[in-house]
């Protein structure tokens, strides 16, 4: 048997050959310092960013968002698109349902002039377009709305009533095998919006399942179950929904955490409402009776007035959000001493927002 030194030398020779043939970093040691911090795209809700454990949706990964109709799936993805664009990124929306409302997207902060949109005729066309965009190395976020609307070409060209068992599941399985490597190389996040279906004849457990087969469940690094739990009212008028999101799968942090936030009609996720809720929970915002105060200054009487105050004073909202994320370890404290002792515990990994300059060519 070869000695330890010979084995180590053979390994180094093999690694050098792999680097020459496939590029530097094709194989690396898991504990090496060459790995970059986890880069993320914020969701628009600080509660959901915290529940995800890394501060947002991970870059270079597949994310599935599913739930009942009108639960906020598209709203959540539009907020993610707006945040990616604000950080200098480029986003694409593949509208297989042909239902994207540009005016609503604009109200949520999406730059509709910069957003790439495709309305494909078939599922094959939609996934091929997505693959080409990812491999360009220039896209930060791709959204496909929805998996259920990715109809195989054979089904579209066939007759009504024809049986096409398993076609969509095979299409998704093949596409995901191709997409996964490209997403990781280009650090592109891909969000699949999905619909719920019911399994017939299920008496034990949940009868709910998602469209498109099982492949997406395996390939997704994050799966989010979004539900509407309450209607928000101003007097007798409905003004929005209270929404709960459960992280049912998470390869980046512990799963099964939940987040609740408000979605207001016409304006989307109430970021300021989430900041007030989390601020009170973590004693950054003080609540005394009906009054909310921050750093000695009154925000307002009642949650709605306090929310409006933060909306009109975005610098205060940003300060509260930063303090929440620092306290929960999602970002480093900018005021921390730079030259900490070498034997001190390492600081939490910073959740880095996407930047156009960070993109790599495929």
Curated annotation (Swiss-Prot):
This is Protein RecA. NCBIfam families: tigrfam_recA. InterPro entries: AAA+_ATPase, DNA_recomb/repair_RecA, DNA_recomb/repair_RecA_CS, P-loop_NTPase, RecA-like_C, RecA-like_N, RecA_ATP-bd, RecA_C_sf. It comes from Clavibacter michiganensis subsp. michiganensis (strain NCPPB 382). Residues 337-362 are annotated as: Disordered. Its main location: cytoplasm. Residues 337-356 have a biased composition (Low complexity). ATP binds at residues 67-74. The gene is recA. GO terms for cellular component: cytosol.
């Amino acid at each position: 048997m070869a000695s330890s030194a010979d084995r180590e030398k053979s390994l180094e020779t093999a690694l050098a050959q792999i680097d020459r043939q496939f590029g530097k970093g094709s194989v690396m040691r898991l504990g090496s310092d060459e790995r970059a911090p986890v880069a993320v795209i914020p969701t628009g809700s600080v509660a959901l960013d915290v529940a995800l454990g890394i501060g947002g949706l991970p870059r270079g990964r597949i994310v599935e968002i599913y739930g009942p109709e009108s639960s906020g799936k598209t709203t959540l993805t539009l907020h993610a698109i707006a945040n990616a664009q604000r950080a200098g990124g480029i986003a694409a929306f593949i509208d297989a349902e042909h239902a994207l409302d540009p005016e609503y997207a604009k109200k949520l902060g999406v730059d509709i002039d910069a957003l790439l949109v495709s309305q494909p005729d078939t599922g094959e066309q939609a996934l091929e377009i997505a693959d080409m965009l990812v491999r360009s190395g220039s896209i930060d976020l791709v959204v496909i709305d929805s998996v259920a609307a990715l109809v195989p070409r054979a089904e579209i060209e066939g007759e009504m009533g024809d049986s096409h068992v398993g076609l969509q599941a095979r299409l998704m399985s093949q596409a995901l095998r191709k997409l996964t490597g490209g997403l990781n190389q280009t650090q592109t996040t891909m969000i699949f919006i999905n619909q719920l279906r019911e399994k017939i004849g299920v008496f034990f457990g949940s009868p709910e399942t998602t469209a498109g087969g099982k492949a997406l469940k395996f390939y997704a690094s994050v799966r989010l179950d979004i539900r509407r739990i309450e209607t928000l009212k101003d007097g007798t008028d409905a003004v929005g929904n209270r929404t709960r999101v459960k992280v049912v799968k998470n390869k980046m942090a512990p799963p099964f955490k939940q987040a609740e936030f408000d979605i207001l009609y016409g304006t989307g996720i109430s970021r300021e409402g989430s900041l007030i809720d989390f601020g009170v929970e973590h004693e950054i915002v003080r609540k005394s009776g009906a009054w909310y105060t921050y750093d000695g200054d009154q925000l307002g009487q009642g949650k709605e007035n306090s929310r409006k105050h933060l909306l009109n004073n975005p610098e205060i909202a940003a300060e509260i959000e930063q303090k929440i994320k620092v306290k929960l370890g999602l970002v480093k404290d900018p005021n921390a001493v730079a030259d900490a002792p070498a034997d001190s515990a390492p600081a939490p990994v910073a959740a880095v927002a996407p930047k156009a300059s960070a993109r790599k060519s495929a």
